[in-house]
């Protein structure tokens, strides 16, 4: 069964454990600059919001890549960059409407979240549960039904 990263910004404290875990998992070093997940800080409101590749169905990055270096991993559901095939042209970074593919200066290639092969380090490291790895079929409709069941039948406001 496919799983996805679910991010609940209301639970994020901005501790950056997700960024540290990601960089260590992928590069063996604790460096937020090398993380494939980022925590955006909305200074005006004090809100912290983790964001990374959503592994979207449209996969604009994959379709834009002129050398087909991005492939869909059928096991994890992730769009994965083949670093051997990638030529570093950055077309995928332009195609991604979410800005979650990054060019890595040291390698001359791009990087993006690959769900750590099915066991995302960011979700495991998150101390507040702001990042979880959940069943992909648990959709918004399922959440609404769950809330409705919790609330029971309420009288209408007629």
Language-model segments: which ranges?
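N-terminal beta-strand motif that seeds the catalytic metal site of vicinal oxygen chelate
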Residues: 1-7
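Flanking helices and flexible, charged tails adjoining ferredoxin-like Fe-S electron-transfer domains
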Residues: 2, 31-67, 83-158
